[in-house]
Amino acid sequence: MRRRPPQLTKTKLADEEVPELTLVPDGVSRWTGSDLDALLNAARRGGAEAAQQDLERKLCRTIDILGARSQQAQEINAVLTSVARLRENSTFRLYLLTQNHRGVGILKVGVKKLFVTHPVTCGLVEVDPLCVLDFYVDESCQRQGYGKMLYSHMLKAEHVSRPEVLAIDRPSNKLLGFLRKHYGLAAYTPQVNNFVVFHSFFDHTTVSERGKLLRAPSPARASPFPSSANATVAIGGAKAKNWTPG
């Protein structure tokens, strides 16, 4: 009886070398589960070029490896970013930073319904903000401005002019320090759901009779999806949206 090969653990996955993405320009590109499905379907189509098949495989491997490294760096039990998780919710967006044609950073965002404590009334209010769900830059590339490049690109692509309107899922002390240094965000009330919403998140808001937080119309309001006016780059039959050169 043949023995089944041992399952690859997240630790081993995190130790893998990130593959070279020769068809992905250096800079920031945006991917969703639907984009990855389209890339997979194109790769499986009869007559697909070997380079296209190679791109799909290496891009998915890059996402899984960086997601595993993020999990390891944060010392958490569950992986936050993987191809499988992106396919589970196609509304989530993954911003991938590549340098020298290799992935060096990821930033995952998506809209979620949350109940958070209002810092003034101390009562629970319902909100549906754009959330930062995972943020990681490879250790070998930290303190070189890549994190700011990735975060700034995401804010622009998501039409967020005020970073304080985002909710942050379980931020590490390093991420809190990053937000304090670059965006002056510091004061917040701890939430039972482990999301961080800064006190300035509640600026220019009111609470409805049903307890829903209402934000005054503003350019700072995050759109669920970037506008079609943003640049796209065709890559192997799929589109890397909102690409910004490195």
Curated annotation (Swiss-Prot):
InterPro entries named among the record's database cross-references: Acyl_CoA_acyltransferase, Atat, GNAT_ATAT
Keywords attached to this entry: Acyltransferase, Transferase
Residue numbers marked as site, Crucial for catalytic activity: 74
GO function terms (MF aspect): tubulin N-acetyltransferase activity
Pfam families: Acetyltransf_16
Catalytic activity: L-lysyl-[alpha-tubulin] + acetyl-CoA = N(6)-acetyl-L-lysyl-[alpha-tubulin] + CoA + H(+)
Top-level class of the enzyme under EC nomenclature: transferase
Domain N-acetyltransferase: 21-202
Binding site for acetyl-CoA: 135-148, 172-181
Any one biological process term the GO annotation gives: regulation of microtubule cytoskeleton organization
Transferase in keyword set: yes
GO cellular component: ciliary plasm; cytoplasm; microtubule; nuclear lumen
Enzyme Commission number, as recorded: 2.3.1.108
Function (record text): Specifically acetylates 'Lys-40' in alpha-tubulin on the lumenal side of microtubules. Promotes microtubule destabilization and accelerates microtubule dynamics; this activity may be independent of acetylation activity. Acetylates alpha-tubulin with a slow enzymatic rate, due to a catalytic site that is not optimized for acetyl transfer. Enters the microtubule through each end and diffuses quickly throughout the lumen of microtubules.
Assigned protein family: Belongs to the acetyltransferase ATAT1 family.
Name of the molecule in the record: Alpha-tubulin N-acetyltransferase
